[in-house]
Regions:
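Short, conserved alpha-helix that lines the donor NDP-sugar binding/gating region
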Residues: 1-2, 85
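Active-site acidic short loop of glycosyltransferases
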Residues: 4-7, 36
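Conserved nucleotide-sugar donor-binding
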Residues: 5-6, 55-68
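Short beta-strand-to-loop acidic/aromatic patch adjacent to the donor-nucleotide binding site
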Residues: 6-17
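A residue-level structural signature of the nucleotidyltransferase/glycosyltransferase Rossmann-like core
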Residues: 9, 56, 93-94
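Short glycine/serine/threonine-enriched helix-capping/active-site loop
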Residues: 11, 38-44, 97-106
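Conserved donor NDP-sugar-binding/catalytic core segment of glycosyltransferases
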Residues: 16-56, 62
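C-terminal catalytic/acceptor-binding lobe
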Residues: 78, 82-166
Length: 166
């Protein structure tokens, strides 16, 4: 993110496709709604239940600099999306918007199971699970994010599943 010029940073897999026109406008508008810019914005990925987990997400440079990371580096291939979803849900700043960023994953029959997938799928999950379960560490980061938010703003879901472009 340090080499990026923009203030909104996306974390995503390399097997995605943007299926919503003007998705970038919708993301920017969501960030504009929150002057403190502390939120995690995501859309439907075609695999997870809508609104459940931010598998591919956007966050602000301000939020990244507060916690000191785009995502925890020690997670490897798995569970950092769970970590980020849990953190932003805890502060009421997990924002699900009507964009479809399709995850073209082998597990859904959308791509061949190649060497790259094999490397990620065969990676040890136990360490990532253990890291994800480190509530004390996550709570510390949640508190850091809370210090940066304007408590007069409350999150509300402006989008409903039936409006979502699936």
């Amino acid at each position: 993110y340090k080499k990026a010029a923009g203030n909104i940073i996306m974390t995503a897999a390399d097997d995605i496709k943007f299926n919503t026109k003007k998705w970038d406008y919708l993301v920017q508008e969501e960030f504009n709604f929150y002057p403190d810019k502390i939120l995690l914005v995501f859309g439907y990925d075609g695999l997870q239940p809508p609104g459940s987990i931010a598998t591919h997400y956007f966050q602000s440079r301000e939020a990244i600099e507060k916690v000191g990371y785009v995502m925890p580096k020690d997670f490897g291939y798995n569970y950092s999306d769970n970590w980020m979803t849990t953190m932003y849900r805890a502060i009421g700043r997990l924002s699900y918007i009507p964009i479809y960023v399709e995850h073209i994953h082998w597990g859904a029959g959308k791509a061949p199971y190649d060497e790259i997938y094999k490397e990620g799928s065969d990676a040890p999950h136990e360490e990532s699970i253990k890291l994800y379960q480190d509530k004390e560490r996550r709570d510390k980061d949640i508190e850091i994010l809370k210090q940066g938010i304007d408590e007069n703003l409350c999150f509300y879901d402006r989008y409903y599943e039936e409006e979502f472009p699936l």
